[in-house]
From Swiss-Prot:
Pfam families (UniProt xref): Anticodon_1, tRNA-synt_1, tRNA-synt_1_2, tRNA-synt_1g
Residue numbers binding ATP: K578
Entry protein name: Leucine--tRNA ligase
Gene this protein is translated from: leuS
Primary site of residence: cytoplasm
Gene3D superfamilies reported for this sequence: 3.10.20.590, HUPs, Isoleucyl-tRNA Synthetase, Domain 1
Gene Ontology annotations for the cellular component aspect, listed alphabetically: cytosol
Motif 'KMSKS' region per UniProt: ranges: 575-579
Keyword Nucleotide-binding: yes
UniProt enzyme class: ligase
SUPFAM superfamilies in the cross-refs: Anticodon-binding domain of a subclass of class I aminoacyl-tRNA synthetases, Nucleotidylyl transferase, ValRS/IleRS/LeuRS editing domain
Amino acid sequence: MNEYNFSDIEKSTQEYWRKNDTFKTIEDNTKEKFYCLSMLPYPSGTLHMGHVRNYTIGDVIARYQKMQGKNVLHPMGWDAFGLPAENAAIKHKKSPYEWTKSNIAYMRSQFDSLGFSFDWSREIATCDEDYYKWEQWFFIQLYKKGLAYRKNSVVNWDPVDQTVLANEQVVDGRGWRSGALVEKKEIPQWFLKITDYADELLQDINKLDNWPEAVKTMQINWIGKSKGLTVKFKVKDSNQEIEVFTTRPDTLMGVNYLGIAPEHPLALKEAKSNSQLAAFIEECKKTSTMEADLATQEKKGFKTSIKVIHPISAETIDVWVANFVLMGYGSGAVMSVPAHDQRDWEFAQKYNIPLKQVIESNDNKLKIDLEKQAFTEKGILINSGEFDGLNFKNAYQAIKKYLTEQNKGYETTNFRIHDWGISRQRYWGCPIPMIHCDDCGAVPEKEENLPVRLPTDVALTEAGSPLKDIPEFINVACPECGKPAKRETDTFDTFFESSWYYARYTCPTANQMLDQEANYWLPVDKYIGGIEHAIMHLLYARFFHKLMRDQGLVKSDEPFKNLLTQGMVLKDGAKMSKSKGNIVDPQELIDKYGADTVRLFSMFAAPPEQSLEWSETGVEGANKFLRKVFNYAELNKVIFAKNITLESQKLTKEDKKARFEIHSNLKQAIFDFDKSQFNTVVSACMKILNTLNNYDNLSESVKVEGFSILLRILAPFTPHLCHYLWQQLNLGEDILHTSFPIVDNNALEKDEFLLVVQINGKLKAKLELDASLSSNQVEEVVLADEHVKSFIDNKQVVKVIYVPQKLINIVIK
């Protein structure tokens, strides 16, 4: 008997796929389409187990849908721009382009060795001119619409990577790539007006029925829509006003001070003549701007000489520069009510600012102790003049009416989300296609001159971008007036590229951004990736899709119908990482056990949404199962050569039992496939093989039927072995283009059933009965059974409880 030689099987199968262009996909209106997509990887150079799991999930889905008769698009590409490649190139003294292309070639070969069914004819790399040309074109369209703009902005500055970070890219006060403490810095930045789409992005979350609730909740919170009042505080002895937004106007009469951001114009003006304030502002620049960090870091402030007038009471109120107020939120000022806001209370305690209680509890029994903490619940107004006695709802309306009539405030809908800063001060990215002219200002490059090519022959350093030092790149003529001008040297945030790549896969060679194929394939039917992308990539991609829709490029409102967020791969309870020394190299596993084993383990060890704990014994178990599958085929290959068909009238009792088990497991597997519960699909395969092995006298036709069902269920998981056996057993040419098995409902109709017999709730017998018996007939047979009679003779049968074809309980006394 032949041994399971996974190496030869996998090589020959991959060669078959290559020769036959098996995975190439074209538009076919006669079939239902299915677009399956896993998030494109950064080409780091080597695959890790997280990659293997993520892309195996996508491949299993794509193969299953293809076997369901659908026209499946399953593409792959590379998120190739960005700092990691630039930093690696500096370290290894190579150009980022050369480094990236070398990594892509190697990773592609690793993907192929795992048997992934990617249509490589649609491959894209975001660093290729043919790709980024069209995002430059799109940016120009957005600029013309006023959806892209440039302004000075206080940004998160990474002093190591020498670039700006979006708020989402700052983790615990540090740069997500470098780990450096982030600083605040004001520089000119390009932005996209995502705030113009905030309402629609929020509303359309309701359309995402097949997204995880956790992701939807994160996006809802990140967009952060809230209704409140903007209140105007007049600066004393000045014509200026400070506007603040509040969702709690019922606490307005309790304002004890205003807090302004360190970058607020009034703070900067006073700092010119106050060295202590200037030093405090410098200190604030070195602290985190992330909300999570602001909530936990020490509250610090500096009392200014500025005073404002309360809009209702006309009291004079102090203004403090506070490290917890962000210039990027609202007007960079907040009203502070220490008695009713915990953060304000902590600040007031530190600086001995008095408290004024203006809300009391609806519950008279509740004791409010402002010495211990703020009272933050809604209640009844007190110490609020004409508004005393009002509840929150009535106070909101009354104070809104007063402020509006006095021109001292107005109702506002506010969003937590802010416009997306898309420019980065690094080299390895897509050049922003803008030109700066002294006479004309910022002017877009002429569309016929696109793409603005990124120079590849550059001297890289760790300090910022070299583009500003390349005369032939930076010195250009103004597209409008023709005078000497300067090209923009900032490049796009890499999230710009990854926000539309899924659409370009539909028409990767089109001489336009998207063509009609986009509307055939979009939206993506199944999208697979990590939950860590919930509020960056997934939100930006939704935004981009709506921008493309409004440009007439796509017709759908949302890019991804169904989202699957896979769990991490752990070893010893921790995420695999070089620093922890717990990395498992997939290539070593492929060499030792074969790609099919690695794929099978990654799908069987845990449900896809949960973390997978690495286990060498689990891998060995997967390999052992595949050897059993191979050995069964070897032992029975003579049977398959006979071309046997199933004849139901010739089936034995044993055949019928086996077919019941096989088709029951097939039915469960189809249900679990559709729910993406792949671990239980693999379990069904194991049960079918056990069934085939456990019955000694199965008809040859049942063996053929059962094993062909097993191979087709297993094929999406272990495509090499199943392809090989399908051909070797003369079942067909290519299992991938074979229809998925259909449940035979006749096989699920049992001639007999096993009945559990209880007496007074205790198990006494198990009887095999004819499935055609009525309830009364079942009762008669059970009561007449000699073994059962031994328990009930000379006893009174009080009642008989029958659960059809499962259980009967005889109550006696």
